[in-house]
């Protein structure tokens, strides 16, 4: 049976955020957020931005992702990541229907692509695997017979509880992935995965460095990302796309991996998922730590 563990520092942060949410005027917040969303949908960008700023004044921790929505409209500063409170709230609320929506409705199959590419390149089996942003255990399940020991990390407690029920992981933590990588003192891993994690992160340096610090030399780091046409970035390394998820320029991903000590084994163009029936372009990257 997996050991369902809580990572003390990130969990303390989550409890503080939950306590802060309890102090918010939820009725006022819902009214302000719905007003901002209606203005955004109407196409009144400037009014929507102002309304989302009012949302942030009520809820500085940003459980509704107002800062990300502002950035998706091309206004304000692009945040380095989606707010932890937003990510935890989003996935806690949707945990029960997550797999049905993501796999069945949005045609998300990245975990199986990970398995297929590892097998095609005859990589593995692996003694120790770290599954960052493990969610309900889709990637862990896809790799279960390729690994002796799998550790899963996710910011959403409800998602981790579902992963725990699957009996896929030896160890599970509720934690923000970069915080975990910074504080972890377990034995290093042979494979680190991060499927559907980068769309909630803008700047990648801390993630890539943390992964490297938790891996054996020669270990593999495999992750998916979303992207946009090169000219859309206008020289930027990353941006929030129209679907409120971070997209990363391929050049940025390549440069950061190399600078931190990874060699790219393979970078493949993929369809990450569908959004309103349209394919979302992305990459599946396999990198080896030097």
Where are these regions (language model features)?
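A short acidic, Gly/Pro-enriched loop at the edge of an enzyme's catalytic core
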Residues: 182-192
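Short, glycine-/aromatic-enriched active-site segment of Class I SAM-dependent methyltransferases
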Residues: 225-246
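N-terminal auxiliary segments of SAM/dcSAM-dependent transferases
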Residues: 22-88
């Amino acid at each position: 049976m997996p050991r369902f563990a809580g990572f003390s520092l990130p969990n303390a942060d989550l409890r503080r955020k939950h306590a802060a949410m309890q102090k918010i005027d939820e009725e006022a917040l819902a009214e302000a957020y719905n007003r901002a969303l209606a203005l955004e949908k109407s196409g009144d960008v400037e009014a929507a931005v102002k309304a989302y700023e009012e949302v942030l004044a009520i809820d500085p921790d940003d459980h509704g992702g107002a800062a990300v929505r502002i950035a998706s409209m091309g206004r304000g500063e692009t945040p380095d990541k989606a707010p932890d409170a937003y990510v935890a709230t989003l996935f806690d609320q949707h945990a029960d229907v997550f797999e049905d929506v993501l796999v069945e409705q949005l045609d998300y199959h990245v975990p199986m692509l990970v398995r297929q590419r590892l097998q095609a390149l005859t990589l593995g089996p692996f003694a120790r695997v770290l599954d960052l942003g493990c969610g309900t255990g889709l990637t862990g399940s896809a790799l279960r017979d390729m690994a002796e020991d799998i550790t899963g990390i996710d910011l959403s407690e409800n998602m981790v509880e579902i992963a725990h029920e699957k009996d896929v992981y030896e160890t599970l933590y509720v934690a923000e992935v970069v915080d975990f990588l910074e504080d972890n003192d377990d034995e290093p891993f042979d494979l680190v995965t991060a499927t559907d994690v980068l769309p909630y992160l803008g700047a990648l340096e801390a993630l890539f460095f943390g992964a490297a610090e938790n891996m054996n030399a020669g270990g593999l780091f495999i992750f998916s990302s979303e992207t946009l046409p090169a000219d859309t970035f206008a020289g930027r390394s990353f941006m929030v796309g129209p679907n409120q998820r971070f997209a990363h320029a391929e050049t940025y991903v390549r440069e950061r991996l190399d600078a931190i000590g990874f060699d790219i084994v393979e970078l493949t163009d993929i369809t990450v998922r569908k959004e309103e029936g349209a394919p979302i372009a992305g990459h599946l990257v396999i990198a080896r730590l030097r």
